Amino acid sequence: AVGVAQSALETGMQYALDRTQFGKALIEFPRVAGKLAMMAVEIMIARQLTYFSAWQKDNDKRCDLEAGMAKLLGARVAWAAADNALQIHGGNGFALEYRISRILCDARILNIFEGAAEIQAQVIARRLLD
């Protein structure tokens, strides 16, 4: 999931650098730059939670709570990043020629493949009650 989110960020960033509106690159517009900045922050948080979960497992510690959190957050961050990158692309984001259209599909399916968000939330809630 973090890889999908990272791909969305990189794709959105490149498009914002390449595409111009009103004589300026899209990245120079505060709303676009803000979207990219928040994507980077959220991706870093999801990545670090994933690393922490893996560290717990590597050190023979219980990690079901952390793994569930990483799955839930990773899938949500991937979807948000793909959606933001699509918004940066504007109408072009829906064209199959643009990579972001595929990334959006990949991000959407993560909640299904990695366990539905509701199931992950239940796993987390049950573990918190232990």
Segments from the language model and where they lie:
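Alpha-helical interface subdomain recognition
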Residues: A1-D130
